[in-house]
Amino acid sequence: MVKIGVCDVNEDETRRTVYLLESQMKNDVIDKDNVTIASHTLESVMLDLDDQRFDYDIFITELSFYNGRNGVELAKRINKAAPSCNIIFYTNKIPNELDIYESRHVNCMLKGRHDGRLVMTTGRLIEALMSEKSKAFIKIRFDRNIIILDCREIMYIRVEG
């Protein structure tokens, strides 16, 4: 199962992006049987990251939020918490003061002009995640926390207690 998270400046923008993806799922452009899409506010994503409950495979986010917050800082936190997460910046405009390459992401595109590219990129990511390449990461759930580890960095696992 591939989990996609969407976070935007406001609920209307988030709903629009979710609707765009879901409409393509109905048209069989995106595999609907193995995909779940969830919408978020910036605050709910931050809470999930703080509580170690963030476990999305693909995360689509805006670059410019209110109160001086930005998607690059959010992406950096996601990179640390969930290194296997594929981040897509889907934005109204790319601010000159932001360096989007400070964080690891797979694509950056403008809303409206690149809607088709968002659907195509998301579809390709889903296909890649469903293949064997995605097996390089494991999710460990303990209590209510989720930890995502890169298998190549694990030397051994010791179980205590």
List the predicted regions and their residue ranges.
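CheY-like receiver
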Residues: 51-132
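Acidic, metal-coordinating helix/loop segments flanking the phosphotransfer/catalytic sites
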Residues: 18-19, 34-57
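Hydrophobic alpha-helices of bacterial signal-transduction systems
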Residues: 16, 21-23, 37, 89-91
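Short helix-capping segments at alpha-helix termini
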Residues: 25-31, 81-82
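Hydrophobic/aromatic residues located in beta-strands of well-ordered beta-sheets
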Residues: 4, 35-36, 87
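Conserved acidic segment of CheY-like receiver
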Residues: 2-22
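A generic structural signal for alpha->beta connector loops
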Residues: 1, 32-33, 84, 105
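Conserved binding/recognition cores within well-folded domains
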Residues: 120-161
